[in-house]
Each structure stands twice: as structure tokens, then as C-alpha cells.
Amino acid sequence: MTPVVALVGRPNVGKSTLFNRLTRTRNALVADFPGLTRDRKYGHANIAGHDFIVIDTGGIDGTEEGVEEKMAEQSLLAIKEADVVLFLVDARAGLLPADVGIAQYLRQRNKTTVVVANKTDGIDADSHIAEFYQLGLGEVEPIAAAQGRGVTQLIEQVLAPLAEKLEAQAVDSDENVADDEQDEWDSDFDFDNEEDTALLDEALEEDQEETDDKNIKIAIVGRPNVGKSTLTNRILGEERVVVYDMPGTTRDSIYIPMERDGQQYTIIDTAGVRKRGKVHLAVEKFSVIKTLQAIQDANVVLLTIDARDGVSDQDLSLLGFILNAGKSLVIVVNKWDGLSQDIKDNVKSELDRRLDFIDFARVHFISALHGSGVGNLFSSIQEAYQCATKKMTTSMLTRILQLAMDDHQPPLVNGRRVKLKYAHPGGYNPPIIVIHGNQIEKLPDSYKRYLSNYFRKSLKIIGSPIRVLFQEGNNPFAGKKNKLTPSQLRKRKRLMKFIKKSKR
């Protein structure tokens, strides 16, 4: 399960700056849910090789009378569901009553907390952070988030060890997600050698065999009241299986195993399968953290949309997180029954307009309440999963690359054409294709999109994102001095003597 890091503290202590540092972007609004989480930000980060969900909880205006009264409900939820809390304080402003109140709240919750003293640039950090030890939360980590100072040390000495500890405790850690930023290849590997490429294909095939006959995890996600629980119950009701919880898997998400046509599935219900009478607030039905974790843990995601409301900004935010996580996708438009033909046409037109960037995903129009169209979902789920784990070989991908270049050659850069040499598989779930060549960094984005679409069409990948990575060919002479042969040295010596004589 992906660990969750919550950034808490008073306003203007640098939480958003640290958020951007950890997520390595200046606008990392992976999932922003207006009206539900207000100014809370959710982002995905890869820290020291470990995946995290990072939350900026916004400023907490606590007072010495009681910080709990001033904490927003979503801040409380974020702290409750976080694995690690980074408590930011302002080293320049010193210890304030609000800091003491927040620290007291965190101690009461017995949450793993790290005090981070920000804005230590240009001051004596040791003397300024000393007073924060009286908070009783252990070591204080000094940083200057705006300049990036101390952030690497915070990652290496605090977050990375915590991630390793959490991963060691995880019960279900069979995710097979490839990280393109850490996709490294041996520079000595010869892709022109058939024996070497055969070994690579064999190794990747072994990885793929682990996904065969696997229990497919399906996450049903969406905004509140779009019919997620109804769809879950309809799927289970059709199959007449006994629903039972699997304790210890994830916080409030319920993992429900089922079987259909000999294939094992696990439905991840982010609604918690609670009785309707016990749910008083809409916000109780929808936890951002539970949804993001369910997406990370799933093989196929069913993004459920209310046909009567259309595609909202919240739907697009969830969609962005699904694509960034590299998950297979099926779009489910619920509550399709009872709509007039004009409204149905308008809904389809809006879907085509707002979701044109994910034309690879199947769209199903269903009624979870009445069951119409629900049974057809599994064919698309199977198709998306099989495409995500599709077998690819180096020779196959290189042949497709050559056909793509024959149809449309790479552009000229400074009078020289970008040369693409070969392609090989880089992983599955999602399919990753690595292309090697020269002057790769000068290849325009338009041509990269062309190659991505060409590979998708040639491989017939539907329902799954595809990642095409580009790597510059290694220069065998890079970093080496030009070493002359003995005959060249003698020739150079004679030439130097001739030059000296001519100058006399």
C-alpha cells in the first residue's frame, strides 16, 4: 500500500514549497477536489525509489485555547489517514502557541511525526531550532525548502527509512508498476546481438508470467453519489457470492473477492460497504486518500461518472491520477436509464469533447440500479488487463519502429536527421517501450506522440496507457582522450621539428 505523507503546520511556514519539492513540480495538483477538500492538495511523489502520496493540508489556525476547534475537517481526515506527518514550523518566527497546540493534537493521535524547521537559510540553524525540541516530538530536521537545502537529507535520513519500514509491514505488496524515471539500462548491453536480446525478452517474459492467471484487482472510483456502492452490489449480486471483509489489507477500503467465468477478481470498494443509515454526511462516503490508494493498488480502474451531472473537474482530477499511476481504465457512465435521447446525445457529445485525450479507453453506459449494461463491463476489464500485460519482444518493437519511420521520417535538426536505432520492452502494467537513438533530446513532442500512437495502433492496445521512453545512444569515445598510435607520435614529432625550423 502506498504510504501517505501529510504536511501540517501554521499558514505560511512553507508547506506548499516543500510539497512542490517532494513532488518535483511547481503545480503538482494531481487531485484537487473543490468544495470537498477546499485548498487541500494531493500529489504523487517518488522519494528515494519509494512511491508516496503527499498531502498539503493547508494552514491550521490553532490557538492556545484548543487547536482542535480551528482544524478543518479535511485536515483531521488527512492526519488520521496519513502514515507519516511532517510538522512544519518557522525557524525564523520561533515557537508559537499555535505550534504547541498542533503538537499536542499530534501527540494525542500517536501519529509518527517529524518536526521540520523551515526557513533556516541565512540564520544559525542550530540555535534557532533548539526551542522546538520542547514540543516533545523527537529530532528537529532543519531545511530551507525555497532553496532546497536540507530536503535531500530529510528524504534520505527520514522518509526513505520510514518507507522501507512501511513496505516491510505491508501484507499485499505484489504491485508490478514500472517507474520510467528509474528505468536504467546497462550501457554494455548489445541490442544488435540476437543472443542478448533473446535473454532480455526471456527475462521480461518471466516477469509477465507472474501476471498470468493473476487475481485481477478492480477499483471502482468516482465522486460521491455516482453509484459506486450500487455498482459493487450489483456485480456481487449477479454473481451470488458471499461478501466478506479481508481485515488488515487497507484502512477503510474493503477488498471483496469474487469469481466470474473461472477468473478470480477482487473488487476494491472505496465506499467501505457501510449501511445507508449509518452514513449521515456525503463526505463520509468519499475519502480522497482511500480513493488514491485504491487506484495505486488496482490493476483496472472503473471511473464512474453520473450521466446526469456530466464530466466534472473532480472526474478529470481523478482521471489524471489514474493516468499518472499507469493504470488500465474503463469509463462507466451510470444512471443512463430514464434519460431522453436528446440528453443522451448531449452527454455523449460532452464525453467526446472533454475526454478526447483518453480515446483508448472503453466507455460503457449502464444503470447500476437496474443492472442494464453491467455484465458487459467484464469484457472490457479483461481486454484492458490483457493489453496492459501484452507480450512484446525486442524484434517486434524494432520492426514496428522501422515501419513508423518509413511512414513518417524523424525531422531534421540542424541539417541532421534524428536517428532512432531500435526499441525494446521496458516492462508491463502499463506497457513500456524504450527507444534508443541519437539526438533524442531534440526530437519534438509531436513526433513522440506520433510514435506512441503508432505503437498503440500496431500493438492493438486498448484500455491501458502506454509509455514510450527515449534514451540517447552512448558515445563509446565520451570522456576518453585521443590516444595516438606510435606511428602517429613519430609523425607528430617530425611535424613539430619542421614547424620549429620554418620559424627560424
Curated annotation (Swiss-Prot):
Residues 3-166, 216-389 form the EngA-type G domain. GTP 1 binds at residues 9-16, 56-60, 118-121. Pfam families: KH_dom-like, MMR_HSR1. One of its GO terms (biological process) is ribosome biogenesis. It comes from the Bacteria. Residues 390-474 form the KH-like domain. Keywords: GTP-binding, Nucleotide-binding, Repeat, Ribosome biogenesis. Belongs to the TRAFAC class TrmE-Era-EngA-EngB-Septin-like GTPase superfamily. EngA (Der) GTPase family. GTPase that plays an essential role in the late steps of ribosome biogenesis. Associates with the 50S ribosomal subunit. HAMAP family: GTPase_Der. This is GTPase Der. The gene is der.
